[in-house]
């Protein structure tokens, strides 16, 4: 096929001239293959690079139900760009999806990522994917594929967006849906590692108002590192707990905080009453509240306030659950109880 005729001095165009560097994409794949290889587990068929990623459901499941989740990192990325810190957002990406599917009792099996940018910086992208692979290792799932989209003009230089997709499996008879939660059950709170990945639009507004020195020491590390601490992944300790005692319900404390996420697992007619004095409010949340003048109710509705996962068990199992999770390295508190709802009352109240 002959190219169309053009002006005598015009040169032929390439994809690189249009802003897409295929060689950079190939270099990225070579850089990230070792990271993905470290996440391999039983069930993975083939490696990265195929048109589709293949995974065989483990034979230990008699009636496997697949559970899927997808999420991003939100405007925490804007802070990552400002700080030029890209090594933690990959774990955030994995955590947001695997913690979500864990809530229904699912074991995460595999993960795929989507990385979109205007101009591909191979080193930055590789750093992000290394974090994704680390998150997959922490949750026992395989990084089996993904997409890197270089789209000139779509994103400002130095910026990118992320999306993640997790698929897990749970035995049909062991799906956790909150249907067995009853009056008198105990709500346990597992400590968060920080803000996690929700509420960063408000965080950034507070930073804009307070104009702090982000490199200054904040309780033993820089304020920047404290703000960017990666989302905690609760998969392995909670999967182990489920093997030992009945977990009636779980809530991943994301956007909406405690007051909007716990109701998602409660039957109509039940309320979780939480005691805000039952666990310590971490210094970072105190700092945000003070410098932003944020009301208590708004704090509980936007941030996790130190609790990244809520677990509901019977009162008889509460102490054993706390002991098991503590032995696994989690900080756990009894933060509330389940009772009958009062007329016109929300399904989660903080007192």
Curated annotation (Swiss-Prot):
GO terms for biological process: 'de novo' IMP biosynthetic process; adenine biosynthetic process. It catalyses: 2-formamido-N(1)-(5-O-phospho-beta-D-ribosyl)acetamidine + ATP = 5-amino-1-(5-phospho-beta-D-ribosyl)imidazole + ADP + phosphate + H(+). GO terms for molecular function: ATP binding; phosphoribosylamine-glycine ligase activity; phosphoribosylformylglycinamidine cyclo-ligase activity. The keyword Ion transport does not apply. It is found in: Cytoplasm. Pfam families: AIRS (PF00586), AIRS_C (PF02769). InterPro entries: PurM-like_C_dom (IPR010918), PurM-like_C_sf (IPR036676), PurM-like_N (IPR016188), PurM-like_N_sf (IPR036921), PurM_cligase (IPR004733). GO terms for cellular component: cytosol. Keywords: ATP-binding, Cytoplasm, Ligase, Nucleotide-binding, Purine biosynthesis. Its EC number is 6.3.3.1. This is Phosphoribosylformylglycinamidine cyclo-ligase. It comes from Burkholderia ambifaria (strain ATCC BAA-244 / DSM 16087 / CCUG 44356 / LMG 19182 / AMMD) (Burkholderia cepacia (strain AMMD)). The lineage of its organism: Bacteria, Pseudomonadati, Pseudomonadota, Betaproteobacteria, Burkholderiales.
């Amino acid at each position: 096929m002959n190219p169309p005729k053009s002006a005598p001095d015009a040169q032929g165009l390439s994809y690189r001239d249009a802003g897409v560097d295929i060689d950079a994409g190939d270099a990225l794949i070579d850089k990230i293959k070792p990271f993905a290889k470290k996440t391999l587990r039983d069930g993975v068929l083939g490696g990265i690079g195929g048109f589709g990623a293949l995974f065989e459901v483990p034979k230990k499941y008699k009636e496997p139900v697949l559970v899927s989740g997808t999420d991003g990192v939100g405007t925490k990325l804007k802070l990552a760009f400002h700080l030029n810190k890209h090594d933690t957002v990959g774990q955030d990406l994995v955590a947001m999806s695997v913690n979500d599917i864990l809530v229904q009792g699912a074991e995460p099996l595999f993960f795929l990522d989507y990385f979109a940018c205007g101009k591909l910086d191979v080193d930055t992208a590789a750093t992000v994917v290394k974090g994704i692979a680390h998150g997959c290792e922490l949750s026992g799932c395989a990084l089996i594929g993904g997409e890197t989209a270089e789209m000139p003009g779509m994103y400002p230089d130095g910026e990118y967006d992320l999306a993640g997709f997790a698929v897990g499996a749970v035995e049909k008879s062991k799906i956790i849906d909150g249907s067995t939660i009853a009056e008198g059950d105990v709500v346990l709170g597992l400590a968060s590692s920080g803000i996690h990945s929700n509420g960063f639009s408000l965080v950034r507004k507070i930073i804009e108002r307070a104009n702090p020195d982000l490199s200054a020491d904040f309780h033993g590390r820089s304020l920047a590192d404290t703000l960017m601490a990666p989302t905690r992944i609760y998969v392995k300790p909670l999967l182990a707990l489920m093997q030992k005692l009945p977990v009636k319900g779980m809530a991943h404390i994301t956007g909406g905080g405690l007051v909007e996420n716990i109701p998602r697992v409660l039957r109509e007619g039940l309320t979780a009453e939480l005691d805000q004095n039952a666990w310590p409010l971490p210094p970072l949340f105190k700092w945000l509240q003070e410098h932003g003048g944020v009301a208590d109710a708004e704090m509980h509705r936007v941030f996790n306030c130190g609790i990244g996962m809520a677990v509901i068990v019977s009162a008889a199992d509460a102490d054993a659950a706390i002991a098991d999770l503590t032995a696994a390295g989690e900080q756990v508190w009894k933060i509330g109880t389940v009772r009958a709802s009062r007329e016109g009352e929300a399904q989660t109240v903080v007192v």
